[in-house]
């Protein structure tokens, strides 16, 4: 073990020294290399051309030179430049990577007429002194590419992709993995006829599994070069538009694939695991399934594939539970098999990839063992299972649907919008969205569905398709009735025309959020008033900070004050009081700062004397536990469930109305604030958890936020509380 670590550290130290020497050699030696580089685009010499751009706005594009940094954000330009660098691998590498790393594409990136015109342009050159910094930066970047391409880890990644491409070329029937023209015989397999079709194809979920495994292993074995391999993998997988966020998604340490029956889940894992074992040195793979009988065929097939492709000598079986593959340099890769009935086989192991087949059906205690590998930084868990929704115990992975980190990948032929329609039409097996995506190797038609239903009712939706109702599970049902939603949207009384008969008090609730992520939470603000037993919404805001600075509390307070100012401006008669509650759960100090700044903003507005100001501005005060001082914030604790119960009852009874003159400065002009609010309300669900059947309301579903809804619910709740003498009080004069 210590020898391996010492060897790895020695190689890293040698590469660091080589990069340092190359950087010192500068342009002179690199120019000489470029003359002998042939068609290797990475050996292109530095092209001296001047650009009228300050240095802080310059960027170095590998293979091109120093340009304006806007070129780095141009996806087409950046992808073409990197593609040309890695394309030379097919000319530079002989054997296994030849002509396989670059997918078929048109080579003409520039119109011929434009190309001819460019040849007539003479570029202004820097002087030797001016060009020195650009030249050094260029060769420094190119040296990193040289170090990447010359590393053994990169050769392994390139070889793995090239071998898998050849395997797909032969529809998984041949084994000419090294490009020598020799194909070993493979066992016969009854399959759909190809009708002369030579090259095979991958289903989208199969390609995604391949990409998840490749991206993660590349990041593990490349070390310092992991950030640069993304451009190469974008090219070989033909995904040039992938963003950095998408790349991070493929590198995350867990992912789940739920796929209908007979779609080639396990069948695809066999060549994937076998090629990974035979290509990546020192890799450790784990494979587990729900029963022992399910792991044995996979074990035998992987061993057979390895012996078929590489002979018997490098393949070694140990006790029927693991397979090791030996490389010429003495390194080994290993796969360990275990069933969920005996998870001790994977305890104490050190895996890089852990495949969990039919994961929905493994035992709960096995799940605990598997989840423990999430604590290992260089291990990725790939769950693969059927989309079973007949029982809650065999559908637990479906609970990941809608998670913020996008762990779940579901293969389905019915979208959520058309699910109910397909259930109602007994002959339908796919909706209009996905009907063209069905593979040719499955029989999914009305006759098949009817036959399945004859054996067992609902078996098609639960066992084959998935997405049906899970028996024994608490499904989230909409809490607001359709009638109440339509009434809230259509019937909007005028608070300006009817101000005389309405209450003269306004209630404001502020739910602050200190984040710049517009996909997460924002600040919700609601302004409500009373008309007898009804509540009327005067104003609503959904505010997001553009940056996290020391003035965040001031910006949130200004948003609240501007909303109130517009409410005051359109109503001629001044309100008697405005009662403000600022939630302090996330930060009590920030809540106090927001309340103070709201008071300052309203004081400024009062001195300006441009709108009718209320007689008093009061703030909700709370005394924290262990303190005798009341502070201007509201702590939301166990009141939330009761507040939502109260609001749902009032809303479904038609007692919550929106003003015809509803104010909103943050909702876009082309969007109706009431419709925007209804979108959040439709996501609200009631979830019952635990043996005590604890009820929890949540509106954060499918990536949507519920900030405006929470603010409205709490504003209605606070305006319904019995009046007390000490709950709301004014702040000291500023």
UniProtKB/Swiss-Prot annotation:
**Can you name this protein?**
Tripartite terminase subunit 3
Return one Gene Ontology term, BP aspect. Answer: chromosome organization
Q: Which UniProt keywords apply?
A: DNA-binding, Host nucleus, Hydrolase, Viral genome packaging, Viral release from host cell
Q: Where is this motif: Nuclear localization signal?
A: 184-190
Predominant cellular place of this UniProt entry's protein: host cell
Q: List the Pfam families.
A: DNA_pack_C, DNA_pack_N
Per the Swiss-Prot or TrEMBL record, the active site comprises 358, 511, 583, 707
Q: Which family does it belong to?
A: Belongs to the herpesviridae TRM3 protein family.
- Motif span (Walker B motif)? 353-358
Name its species. Answer: Equine herpesvirus 1 (strain Ab4p)
Q: Which HAMAP family match?
A: HSV_TRM3
Q: Tell me where it resides.
A: Host nucleus
Q: Kindly state the positions of the motif Walker A motif in this protein.
A: 259-266
The record's top EC class is: hydrolase
| Molecular function GO labels | DNA binding; hydrolase activity
| Subunit and partners | Interacts with the terminase subunits TRM1 and TRM2. Interacts with portal protein.
Q: What does this protein do?
A: Component of the molecular motor that translocates viral genomic DNA in empty capsid during DNA packaging. Forms a tripartite terminase complex together with TRM1 and TRM2 in the host cytoplasm. Once the complex reaches the host nucleus, it interacts with the capsid portal vertex. This portal forms a ring in which genomic DNA is translocated into the capsid. TRM3 carries an RNase H-like nuclease activity that plays an important role for the cleavage of concatemeric viral DNA into unit length genomes.
Enzyme nomenclature, EC number: 3.1.-.-
